[in-house]
Structures are given as C-alpha cells and as structure tokens.
Amino acid sequence: MKLIFDIQLFAHKKAGGSTRNGRDSESKRLGVKRSDGQFVLAGNILVRQRGTKFHPGKNVGRGGDDTLFALVTGYVKFENKRGRKVVSVIPAEEMVAAQ
C-alpha cells in the first residue's frame, strides 16, 4: 500500500494584537446658540461655554457651567467692553420705543 501526501502551504498571517487607539469622547455641543439681533425668550440659552469666553451683560444670567441665558424677552446684543466679549439682551419694549 502506497500513501501519497499532498501538502499545500497557503499564505497566512498571524493575528496581531489589539490597538490602544480608537476611542473619542462625545462632543459637548458648545458655542454660540443665538446670534446678534436675534429675538429670544426669557430662559433661552445664548452661549454654551467652558470658562467665561463670553461674559454676561444686561439681562443675561450665568449658569453653574458658565452657560449664558436670557433673563428677559428681547433681542441679543454682542459687544466688546474693556477687551471682553459681553452678551446682553435688550428688552423688546425698549426696542419698540427706540423705533
């Protein structure tokens, strides 16, 4: 009895180790939410930020996470005061009286 072995070697690659990359944190959706001259209601968020890149002006409150929000219904006003960016809300009644 004669045995015949047909040995075939195929290309192969050993599995590599896992990488340590490939993760990222979720975006925090920071930034300006209402633009200059835009009508806002009291309580609307104007700016979401880390730190005070924008400072609260008239009729604008600052939350615990430095979020700026409107305290009154009116129109948003962005301005520079003493080298600081300041966000204010001009009440709707004042805008009507000025026109």
Curated annotation (Swiss-Prot):
It holds the Pfam family Ribosomal_L27. Gene3D superfamilies: 2.40.50.100. The N-terminus is cleaved by ribosomal processing cysteine protease Prp. GO terms for biological process: translation. GO terms for cellular component: cytosolic large ribosomal subunit. The keyword Repeat does not apply. GO terms for molecular function: structural constituent of ribosome. Transmembrane segments: none annotated. Residues 1-10 form a propeptide. This is Large ribosomal subunit protein bL27. It comes from Caldicellulosiruptor saccharolyticus (strain ATCC 43494 / DSM 8903 / Tp8T 6331). The lineage of its organism: Bacteria, Bacillati, Bacillota, Bacillota incertae sedis, Caldicellulosiruptorales.
